Amino acid sequence: MEKLDSLNEAFKSLLREEKFGSQSEIVTALQEMGFEHINQSKVSRMLSKFGAVRTRNTKMEMVYHLPAELGIPTTSSPLRNLVIDIDHNESLIVVRTSPGAAQLIARLLDSMGKAEGILGTIAGDDTIFITPTRDTSISTLIATITELFDSSL
């Protein structure tokens, strides 16, 4: 467990430097720090786990970093605290979330699937597009989604 903790600390320390633009660069840096068994898939999982996002640093380079303004959303965070707004037009529903929470919530929505009227989702950092199934009305799907976010998990 101690080795995992030191890996996590080294990983977070590297991301705070805001100079790594690819997962392979992070892998190389961790290997140079003595974590020789690290690979790209492990780094990818860690990026998701810690809520890392790619943004432009002060040099205008796209780099990975940890969002500072909010805690990392987890599956134990109440959904109502992560969802900021729900809006729609005649064919799509748009959900605005706290930074870093969109992919977590989109994954939850995707798991509901076609039976609940969700054909699919596309998530960025803080925005989700939801496409309803052919036979589901926008109003019905909004009611389902709103109920999910209002429930206490």
Swiss-Prot record:
Localisation per UniProt entry: Cytoplasm
Gene coding for it: argR
The family this protein is said to belong to: Belongs to the ArgR family.
Name of this chain's protein: Arginine repressor
Biological pathway: Amino-acid biosynthesis; L-arginine biosynthesis [regulation]
Gene Ontology BP terms: L-arginine biosynthetic process; protein complex oligomerization; regulation of arginine biosynthetic process
GO cellular component, one term: cytoplasm
Function: Regulates arginine biosynthesis genes.
Any one GO MF annotation of this record: arginine binding
Keyword Heme attached: no
Keywords: Amino-acid biosynthesis, Arginine biosynthesis, Cytoplasm, DNA-binding, Repressor, Transcription, Transcription regulation
Alphabetized PANTHER family for the sequence: ARGININE REPRESSOR (PTHR34471:SF1)
InterPro entries in the record: Arg_repress (IPR001669), Arg_repress_C (IPR020899), Arg_repress_C_sf (IPR036251), Arg_repress_DNA-bd (IPR020900), WH-like_DNA-bd_sf (IPR036388), WH_DNA-bd_sf (IPR036390)
Main location: cytoplasm
